[in-house]
UniProtKB/Swiss-Prot annotation:
The record marks 123 as: Transition state stabilizer. It holds the Pfam family URO-D. Residues 1-64 are annotated as: Disordered. Residues 38-50 have a biased composition (Basic and acidic residues). Residues 23-37 have a biased composition (Low complexity). It is found in: Plastid, Chloroplast. Its EC number is 4.1.1.37. Keywords: Chlorophyll biosynthesis, Chloroplast, Decarboxylase, Lyase, Plastid, Porphyrin biosynthesis, Transit peptide. Coiled coil: none annotated. This is Uroporphyrinogen decarboxylase, chloroplastic. It comes from the Eukaryota.
Length: 393
């Protein structure tokens, strides 16, 4: 089992090892500098008893040499090695549901760039067939839900997701990834948030205006709440399953929650996210949980109320402002604009340093504000990681 692997020993990835980082009073006050990669500082290990720590104890500051770094969608379509693999295996579902392919794709950026986090190659919709919701991902169109859930009867047919039965390849892949990266990086899993999953399932796929999910929310809220509860129970179980099989941190994607007004977010997203976090805390109190919601500027103060350890900011929120609005007990991730990777190397460097300086020297995971875009030059991604790993506080 992956849980037998030793804990991460790299100081730069301490935020993934234990839930102890915080913004602190000096966030944004220090300027990063370049230093030799051999420099190291001490850091605090997770609680040896594995028990629940008090809030203050969980959030004690850790001294680290630099912010850990990984990128959303770091494994994917911008890489030539991935493009060649797609020619052999054109079906996305085959690539994301075959153990060997999942491991190979997940490790492609690790072998080239050596990020501090290696995220499982998968999709937030992967659990749907196990919940009696058939779907596919069609090239040029995206996710397609064959039988959208738009009635009480349809929602009643949705069953609880049992990961061991429906996605054993996820657990197998996570175990292999832990063995492959050993103690040199954190292995990350991820899940979709209840409202985002419900949006896909009610709309029938991606949407520009979310008319159908909002129609259900505002005219038949009981039906939507029933569906959200089913996703909540299932995703909590899925996070635990991933952790039991080697995931050292899990990111929750609530991509479409920002289509809701603050009041509607508090009804249709926030309580279910909090329920997931509370459930995971009962069995996995030291598992770091990250929440990403694109375009979350209007909801920012509400995101820490979910109880997650890290809020991942998109690039439309200034990092320094985001720090202030989130408060000192929430770590941050992000938030370089993915478009920056199309700029010159000098420009990329400036943006990285600006982000790190504004984030401060504790409780920050360097990342993009969204996934890497198709067509991003690989050499610029390599430069991003080179600069990031050369930073010293």
């Amino acid at each position: 089992m992956a849980t037998a692997c030793p804990p991460l020993s790299l100081p730069s990835t301490s935020l993934f090892r234990g839930r102890s980082a915080r913004a602190g009073p000096n966030a944004g006050s220090s300027r990063p500098s370049a230093a030799a990669p051999s420099e190291r500082r001490s850091w605090r290990r997770p609680r040896p008893d594995g028990g629940r720590a008090a809030a203050g104890e969980r959030n004690q500051r850790e001294e680290v040499e630099r912010p850990p770094v990984w990128l959303m969608r770091q494994a994917g379509r911008y890489m030539k090695s991935y493009q060649l693999l797609c020619e052999r295996y054109p079906s996305f579902r085959e690539r994301s549901e075959n153990v060997d392919l999942v491991v190979e794709i997940s490790l492609q950026p690790w072998k080239v760039f050596k990020p501090d986090g290696v995220i499982l190659f998968s999709d937030i919709l992967t659990p749907l067939p196990g919940m009696n919701i058939p779907f596919d991902i069609v090239k040029g169109k995206g996710p397609v839900i064959y039988d959208p859930l738009r009635t009480a009867a349809a929602v009643n047919e949705v069953r609880e997701f049992v990961p061991e039965e429906w996605v054993p390849y996820v657990g197998q892949a996570l175990n292999i990834l832990r063995q492959e990266v050993k103690n040199e990086a954190a292995v990350l899993g991820f899940v979709g948030a209840p409202f985002t999953l419900a949006s896909y399932c009610v709309e029938g796929g991606s949407s520009k205006n979310f008319t159908l999910i909002k129609k259900m929310a505002f005219s038949e809220p009981a039906i939507l709440h029933n569906l959200l509860q089913k996703f909540t129970t299932s995703m909590a179980n899925y996070i635990k399953y991933q952790a039991d099989n080697g995931a050292q941190a899990v990111q929750i994607f609530d991509s479409w929650a920002t289509e809701l007004s603050p009041a509607d977010f508090e009804e249709f997203s926030l309580p279910y996210l909090k329920q997931i976090v509370d459930s995971v805390r009962e069995t996995h109190p030291d598992l770091p949980l990250i929440l990403y919601a694109s375009g979350s500027g209007g909801l920012l103060e509400r995101l820490p109320l979910t109880g997650v350890d890290v809020v991942s900011l998109d690039w439309t929120v200034d990092m320094a402002e985001g720090r202030k609005r989130l408060g000192s007990n929430t770590a941050v991730q992000g938030n370089v604009d993915p478009g920056v990777l199309f700029g010159s190397k000098e420009f990329i460097t400036r943006r990285i340093y600006d982000t790190v300086q504004k984030a401060g020297n504790v409780g920050h995971v360097l990342n993009l504000g969204h996934g890497i875009k198709v067509g991003t030059p690989e050499e610029n991604v390599a430069h991003f990681f080179e600069v990031a790993k050369g930073i010293r506080y």
